[in-house]
């Protein structure tokens, strides 16, 4: 994405926050200091996003910190990885939940729930945010908004799984959409409702990469990607101008996008 386009997107997001419907739903503790995954490593976005959701959540969810070992963010993150991340995955054969490549959304949910059970707190659910057969992009948008708002309203800022895709052409093969890199962020602010005709909604999120609070937009892609036979997109765009997800791995001339793929929350 060019520098000029990034500036234009940031100006657009500023206008959306300033002029849109004044009803917003916020994380209960949205001003809390973000946790930086790099305290442990570049593959620790999952544990860091989990901690950011606990920290920016209501007092009930913040209680999860009391059962973690350690006295600072680095030690607590290392405790999560060691105590619940290294347990055997129920979803990936012969692998721990967390490894050098990071963690998948199902395993991250299981890790979070192990911590929550230890703290005698309710458990979380995972939702895949791809369009179901027969649904329209507008229905996917409405369902995504509903789930995110429900979790925020329950005091738990949802964890979003976002992925960078590239339309990649390999030798002797047709070009196909390929996952380049995945990442986890914590959603902390969104509009209470979608207006008629809306194709997306503005969000504020905590990015664990260097522990930043950022603005973005989630919505129906203007140009279809990972489309079905009717040319309709399978998922929603995550227009996150500040995100660095997989940018360095894009080949010259490749078409690329960041999409919302799943979420973990209280619904």
Regions picked out by a protein language model, each given a short descriptive name:
Residues 92-191:
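Predominantly the structural core of cysteine protease catalytic domains
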Residues 145-146, 163-267:
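Active-site signature of cysteine proteases
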Residues 40-45, 157, 182-184, 200-202:
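Extracellular structured ligand-interaction cores
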Residues 80-88, 112, 140-152, 256-267:
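Generic hydrophobic, helix-prone segments enriched in Leu/Val/Ile
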Residues 2-10:
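Sec-dependent signal peptide recognition
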Residues 17-110, 114, 266-267:
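Active-site-adjacent structural segments surrounding the nucleophilic cysteine of cysteine proteases
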Residues 12-15:
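Repetitive helical segments and hydrophobic/amphipathic motifs
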């Amino acid at each position: 994405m060019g520098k000029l386009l990034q500036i234009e997107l940031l100006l657009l997001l500023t206008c959306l926050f300033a002029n849109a419907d004044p009803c917003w739903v916020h994380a209960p503790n949205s001003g809390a200091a973000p946790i930086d995954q790099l305290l442990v490593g570049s593959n620790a976005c999952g544990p860091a996003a989990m901690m950011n959701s606990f920290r920016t959540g209501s007092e009930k969810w913040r209680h999860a910190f009391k059962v973690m070992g350690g006295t600072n963010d680095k030690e607590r993150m290392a405790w999560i990885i060691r105590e619940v991340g290294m347990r055997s995955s129920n979803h990936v054969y012969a692998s721990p939940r967390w490894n050098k490549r990071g963690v998948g959304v199902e395993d991250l949910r299981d890790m979070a729930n192990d911590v929550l059970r230890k703290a005698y707190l309710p458990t979380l659910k995972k939702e895949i945010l791809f369009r179901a057969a027969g649904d329209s992009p507008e229905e996917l948008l409405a369902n995504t908004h509903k789930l995110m708002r429900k979790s925020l309203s329950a005091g738990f800022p949802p964890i979003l799984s976002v992925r960078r895709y590239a339309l990649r052409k390999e030798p002797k093969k047709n070009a196909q959409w390929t996952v380049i890199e995945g990442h986890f962020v914590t959603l902390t602010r969104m509009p209470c409702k979608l207006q008629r005709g809306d194709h997306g909604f503005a969000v504020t999120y905590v990015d664990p990469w260097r522990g930043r609070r950022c603005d973005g937009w989630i919505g129906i892609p203007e140009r279809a990607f990972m489309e079905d036979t009717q040319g309709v997109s399978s998922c929603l765009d995550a227009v996150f101008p500040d995100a660095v997800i997989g940018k360095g791995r894009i080949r010259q001339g490749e078409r690329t996008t960041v999409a919302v793929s799943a979420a973990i929350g209280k619904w």
